[in-house]
């Protein structure tokens, strides 16, 4: 099914934020912070995997992902979609179906030997591959999968995250020659939280303190205070 409608970016971002709140995918715990893939400590966590259990919401989010890519990257820019083990795999399958493309997945660790040891599925040499993750903060885990695809002979110029923390900008992606596409960010989540009063004042203050100075907050709460980008 090829996407043919292209909603406004702001509308998509707000709706995804509302849907994540609706399915209770937003978690807060400043006393026992969450540890992100980057090694950072965070008082908030978005469980995008919950989207899979809500078919209407899941379908809408994947429609938005397809619209975002077709509009911003183009209709004939990819030869296959790659999902990273584990969270990216189902979203890769859903997106590949919408775009009418083959799908592969990338293991966290090689299985066996050879340049394709981390790749499951058919990826011919020189394939233009889009890597998808459910969410990304600094790109740490996404680039592990991107590097594996490149090492196996694939070309990766684009990545997409359904949710992007957007607290460090995109320098890591610029340096890695990858254009990052995304649908919603933490600023969208906060806008909905404020409008619907989903956080009390103390919680809101803690979340904003983290978003304004994430590494400082992380360092004070058991996480890394600097990133190797």
From Swiss-Prot:
Catalytic activity: orotidine 5'-phosphate + diphosphate = orotate + 5-phospho-alpha-D-ribose 1-diphosphate
InterPro entries: OPRT, Or_phspho_trans_dom, PRibTrfase_dom, PRTase-like
Pfam family, one: Pribosyltran
GO MF entry, a single one: orotate phosphoribosyltransferase activity
Pathways per UniProt: Pyrimidine metabolism; UMP biosynthesis via de novo pathway; UMP from orotate: step 1/2
Origin superkingdom: Bacteria
Disulfide bridge map: none
UniProt record, GO biological process: 'de novo' UMP biosynthetic process; pyrimidine nucleobase biosynthetic process
EC number in record: 2.4.2.10
Xref: Gene3D superfamilies: 3.40.50.2020
Residues that hold 5-phospho-alpha-D-ribose 1-diphosphate according to the record: 107-108, 111, 113, 133-141
Positions annotated to bind orotate: 137
Keywords: Glycosyltransferase, Magnesium, Pyrimidine biosynthesis, Transferase
Cofactor dependence: Mg(2+)
HAMAP family (UniProt xref): PyrE
Annotated function: Catalyzes the transfer of a ribosyl phosphate group from 5-phosphoribose 1-diphosphate to orotate, leading to the formation of orotidine monophosphate (OMP).
Subunit structure: Homodimer.
Protein family according to the UniProt entry: Belongs to the purine/pyrimidine phosphoribosyltransferase family. PyrE subfamily.
Name by which UniProt lists this protein: Orotate phosphoribosyltransferase
């Amino acid at each position: 099914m090829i996407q043919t409608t292209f909603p406004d970016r702001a509308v998509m971002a707000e709706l995804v934020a509302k849907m994540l709140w609706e399915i209770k995918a937003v978690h807060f715990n400043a006393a026992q912070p969450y540890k992100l893939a980057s090694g950072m400590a965070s008082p908030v966590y978005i469980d995008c995997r919950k989207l899979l259990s809500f078919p209407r919401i899941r379908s809408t989010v994947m429609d938005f992902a397809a619209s975002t890519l077709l509009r911003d990257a183009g209709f004939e820019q990819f030869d296959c979609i790659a999902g990273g083990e584990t969270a990216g795999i189902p979203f890769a399958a859903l997106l590949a179906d919408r775009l009418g493309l083959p799908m592969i997945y990338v293991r966290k660790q090689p299985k066996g030997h050879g340049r394709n040891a981390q790749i499951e599925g058919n990826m011919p040499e020189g394939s233009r591959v889009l890597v998808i993750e459910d969410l990304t903060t600094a790109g740490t885990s996404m680039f592990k999968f991107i590097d594996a695809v490149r090492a196996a002979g694939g070309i990766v110029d684009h990545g997409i995250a359904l949710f992007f923390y957007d607290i460090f900008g995109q320098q890591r992606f610029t340096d890695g020659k990858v254009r990052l596409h995304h649908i919603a960010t933490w600023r969208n989540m906060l806008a909905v939280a404020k409008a619907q009063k989903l956080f009390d004042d103390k919680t809101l203050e803690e979340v904003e303190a983290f978003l304004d100075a994430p590494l400082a907050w992380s360092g004070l709460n058991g996480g890394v205070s600097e990133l190797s980008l």
